[in-house]
């Protein structure tokens, strides 16, 4: 149920791919994948890099994106999208895929890719809402207690499949679907979600066509608005205060007006992407599975020492035997030279 763009020609979104990025950008990209917990750099951050806004935006966003309150807000958005998808009606699709010639292993591979983007798109909408408000005076900073400020584990989940993308300049049925996606989303290019699912052209054609049947229904438009409002509300309740000064953008070489316009493009597109992927997930695995995070964090098994946030201005409590400065060896044996 991707957010529908106007019928006019859409300018292609400028991005900086990894092969074009300088060393500093690559370093930020690596941090992004670890903190967002996904195997490829999301399109949002490549587009920010093209506007020379990646460094200040990531510096502001990073403290918020790494806390439990952010992760759980994205979980809530994902669950809401699944409920809205069920309300729109989305019959199970596995039988159609078998008729299309896909075997069990191929359907599992499709499921693995749907899980990735069903997981990450909700986090990206949260990130966009945080950044947009951060540029308009600031957002967040609501006291939530130590639970909300607990750190999210770093790194890609071990059970997340690799992401393999097909080229955008596809042929045949896939080329037709990709043209529709470019126009429909208002980004002028095909997001990674659909380039990953493009490995199975018949599936993507079926799923995309089915999702588009609902676009003009009032309940579908209301669902998109509800997802956007929910993300805005969740961003406002984060425990970490996020602000971006226009001077910081200009110092990095970015135009604040262009950065705002970029964020608005993603703000329009992402509620629909979230709803589309929720539809795809419900069609594959049913409503109950779609409401759950595909890559849940087992918080009770996480070491509080490693993942509990300590404020920058708070003294760090040392344990017995911890070194108090760099000159102390902490009781370690001296190396023999």
Predicted regions and their residues:
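Hydrophobic alpha-helical segments
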Residues: 1-337
């Amino acid at each position: 149920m991707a957010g529908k763009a106007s019928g006019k020609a859409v300018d292609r979104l400028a991005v900086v791919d990894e092969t074009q990025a300088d060393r500093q950008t690559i370093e930020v990209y690596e941090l992004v994948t670890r903190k967002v917990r996904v195997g490829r750099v999301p399109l949002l951050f490549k587009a920010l890099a093209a506007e020379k806004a990646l460094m200040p935006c990531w510096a502001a966003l990073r403290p918020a994106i790494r806390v439990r309150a952010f992760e759980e807000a994205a979980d809530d958005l994902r669950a809401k999208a699944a409920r809205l998808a069920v309300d729109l009606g989305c019959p199970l699709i596995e039988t159609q895929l078998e008729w299309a010639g896909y075997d069990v292993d191929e359907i599992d591979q499709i499921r693995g890719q749907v899980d990735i983007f069903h997981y990450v798109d909700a986090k990206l909408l949260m990130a966009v809402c945080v950044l947009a408000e951060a540029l308009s005076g600031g957002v967040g900073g609501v006291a939530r207690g130590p639970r909300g400020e607990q750190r999210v584990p770093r790194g890609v989940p071990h059970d997340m499949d690799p992401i393999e993308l097909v080229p955008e300049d596809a042929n045949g049925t896939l080329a037709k679907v990709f043209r529709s996606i470019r126009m429909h989303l208002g980004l002028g290019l095909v997001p990674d979600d659909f380039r990953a699912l493009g490995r199975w052209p018949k599936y993507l054609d079926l799923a995309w066509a089915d999702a588009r049947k609902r676009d003009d229904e009032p309940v579908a438009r209301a669902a998109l608005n509800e997802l956007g409002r929910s993300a805005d509300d969740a961003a406002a309740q984060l425990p970490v205060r996020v602000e971006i000064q226009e001077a910081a953008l200009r110092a990095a070489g970015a135009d604040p007006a262009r950065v705002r316009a970029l964020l608005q493009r993603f703000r329009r597109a992402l509620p629909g992407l979230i709803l589309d992927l929720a539809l795809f997930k419900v069609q594959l695995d049913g409503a109950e599975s779609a409401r759950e995070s595909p890559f849940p964090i087992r918080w009770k098994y996480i070491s509080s020492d490693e993942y509990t946030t300590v404020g920058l201005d708070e003294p760090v409590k040392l344990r017995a035997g911890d070194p108090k400065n760099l000159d102390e060896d902490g009781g370690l044996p001296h190396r023999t030279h």
